Amino acid sequence: MRILFISILIVLMSVKVRAQKTKIIYVGDPLCSWCYGFAPEIAMVKEHFDSLHFQVVIGGLRPYNTETMADLGDFLKEHWEAVEGRSKQPFNYGIIEDKTFVYDTEPPARAVIVMRELNRKAEFEFFKEVQHLFYVENKNTNDVKVYLPLLEKYEVDPEEFENTFESSWAKMEVKKDFQLAQQMNISGFPALLLDHEGKLYVVCKGYAKADAIIGAIEKVVGQ
C-alpha cells in the first residue's frame, strides 16, 4: 500500500487522449484507507462540478490477496491511524482483531462494478457505502450477503445483484478496471484525473483537500 502525502498537483502529466467532453476520473478502491479518508473531499468535488461527467475507476489495491489480519493487522492499523488523524473520518479497529479475516480487495471492488451495471447513477454512493461497511461497521466484504441490505434504496433486485456478483462476467469486468488504472500509470490511490480537450491531466495523487482540488480543476477548465 503506497501512501502519498501531497496536497495538490496541478497538471503533473498531460498526454494525448481521444477528444471528448470534460470528465473527472476518480481512481480509488473501496478498501483503500486513504480513499476512505478522502471520501468527504471527493464528494465535495463531485458536487461542485455537478455539470461534468464523473467516472469511477476501481484501481485494485490488494485483489486476490490471501493474507489475513494475522499477517497484516499491525501494518494496516498504523496506516488507518494516520488516515484517521488527518481526515477525521471514523474508524472501527475491531476487524483487525479478527485474525481469520482475509484482506482481499477484489470482492468489494466487484460489488461496485455490479452496482455500476445495475444502476450506474448509484455507483459512487454505493462505493462510499461499501467503505462504511468495512471501516465503520466492520462487515465481511468478501461475502456478497453484506451488500444486499443496501440495495433497496437503489432499486436493485438482491437476487440479480447476487447472481451478477458471482458471474464470470463480473469477475472479468473488475479486472478491466484494474487494467485501466495501470494503463493510466496509476498505482497509488486515491488519484484524480481530468480529461479535458483531448488531454489527460493528473490533478492529484494521494489525499488532498477539496478546495485545493477544485481550484486546480478550475484553472484548467476555466470555470
Where are these predicted regions, by residue range?
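C-terminal cap of thioredoxin/glutaredoxin-like
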Residues: 27, 38-47, 132-223
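Bacterial Sec-dependent N-terminal signal peptides
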Residues: 1-21
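Structural alpha/beta surface segment adjacent to cysteine/selenocysteine redox centers
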Residues: 36-134, 138, 143
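A structure-centric signal for secondary-structure junctions around beta-strands
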Residues: 21, 108, 188-189
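Cys/His-enriched microdomains
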Residues: 30
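Cys/His/Pro-rich metal-binding microdomains
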Residues: 33
